[in-house]
């Protein structure tokens, strides 16, 4: 009997020890997970007093143009440091990352936005494409906070240096379009009074955005100022990607209508605005130059076309709105 009692006591002790070991292992797993989260790498912040952090172009030979602040889109994947830490951001001090932003987009946009204007585009720690591929609003919001802080800091530096008697243009594509929306919420009323127009290319502007800031007013025509131009292009409304193109405003940059009046580009591509879905529908356009990207973009939407398909329309419109701003401000 005593022997049996001892065996039961031993079994109980072993069971308690087993539970303790299991709890310890689980705690270690939790600590490992926490360590993994902490072990993410955040690149060094930009220094916007350093000319290396900018792509600029001065095409305003007679001093009658606008100052254009342009925000580049997304060019980096998640990457890993030599010591194994994952990074969700572009590294502005990495020459390869800067080259991706500058050579693939910033300089090409400057080629049509800078003639007649002064063009400024900052490098910033933009969020990698993986955040957007989650299709999760919360993930995108959380990841892009660092990126938006960089953009706001760059804008403050730009604004402190520029001649404020000149009209201001803010423009950006994709993640850069998101940055334009955030900048409009960020700027004060005095800065907003200098705004000829803001261009959100290939991203959404929602009712919540407009409720958050009186600085976000949808453009209604070709020459109104202090307004936001927003558009996203698809082959059919069934291809609207809500995360990016689920907008509550849209204007056709070919004819500057906000209704379904179709407009034709010189190469017979017809662009028609859908008032129901607030997107542009392109017909007679294969968009073969923009192949599908990982089953996420360019799969019926034509996301990659936004800064390029309408470049001549945008170039002309920036001049028109800057001219109208000068007329109404006596500048």
Language-model segments: residues:
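Active-site-proximal beta-strand/loop segments in catalytic clefts of secreted hydrolases
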Residues: 71-74, 123-127, 173-174, 200-204, ...
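Loop/turn elements at helix/coil->beta-strand transitions in domains of secreted/extracellular proteins
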Residues: 64-66, 115-119, 164-167, 193-197
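Surface cap/lid and interfacial helix-loop subdomains adjacent to catalytic sites
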Residues: 147-164, 185-330
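Structural recognition of the beta-strand scaffold that forms the well-ordered cores
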Residues: 67-71, 120-123, 169-170, 197-200, ...
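Short, well-ordered, mixed-charge alpha-helical segments that flank or form enzyme active sites
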Residues: 128-131, 177-178, 205-209
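Flexible, membrane-associating and regulatory peripheral segments of lipid-active enzymes
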Residues: 2-11, 15, 20-106, 111
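Gly/Ala-rich beta-loop-alpha elbow adjacent to hydrolase catalytic centers
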Residues: 172-176, 180
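Active-site catalytic motif of lipid deacylating hydrolases and related acyltransferases
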Residues: 72-166, 291-305, 311-331
């Amino acid at each position: 009997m005593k022997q049996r009692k001892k065996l039961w006591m031993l079994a109980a002790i072993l069971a308690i020890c087993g539970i303790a070991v299991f709890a310890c292992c689980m705690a270690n797993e939790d600590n490992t997970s926490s360590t993994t989260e902490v072990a993410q790498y955040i690149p060094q912040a930009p220094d916007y007093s350093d000319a290396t952090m900018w792509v600029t172009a001065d095409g305003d030979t007679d001093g009658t143009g606008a100052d254009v602040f342009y925000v580049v889109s997304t060019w980096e994947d998640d990457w890993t440091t030599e010591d194994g830490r994952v990074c969700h951001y572009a590294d502005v001090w990495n020459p390869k990352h800067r080259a991706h932003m500058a050579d693939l987009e910033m300089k090409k946009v400057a080629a049509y936005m800078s003639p007649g204007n002064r063009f400024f585009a900052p490098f910033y720690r933009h969020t990698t494409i993986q955040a957007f591929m989650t299709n999760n609003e919360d993930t995108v919001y959380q990841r892009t906070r660092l990126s938006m802080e960089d953009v706001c800091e760059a804008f403050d530096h730009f604004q402190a240096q520029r001649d404020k008697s000149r009209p201001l243009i803010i423009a950006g594509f994709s993640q850069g379009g998101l940055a334009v929306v955030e900048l409009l919420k960020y700027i004060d009323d005095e800065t907003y009074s200098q705004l000829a127009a803001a261009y959100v290319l290939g991203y959404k502007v929602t009712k919540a955005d407009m409720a958050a800031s009186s600085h976000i007013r949808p453009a209604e025509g070709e020459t109104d100022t202090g307004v936001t131009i927003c558009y996203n292009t698809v082959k059919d409304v069934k291809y609207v990607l809500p995360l990016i193109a689920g907008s509550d405003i849209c204007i056709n940059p070919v004819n500057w209508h906000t209704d379904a009046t179709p407009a034709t580009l010189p190469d017979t591509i017809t662009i028609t605005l859908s008032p129901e879905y607030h997107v542009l529908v392109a017909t007679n356009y294969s968009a073969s130059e923009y192949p599908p990207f990982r089953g996420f973009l360019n799969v019926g939407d034509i996301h990659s076309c936004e800064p390029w398909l309408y470049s001549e329309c945008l170039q002309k419109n920036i001049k028109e709105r800057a001219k109208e701003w000068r007329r109404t401000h006596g500048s």
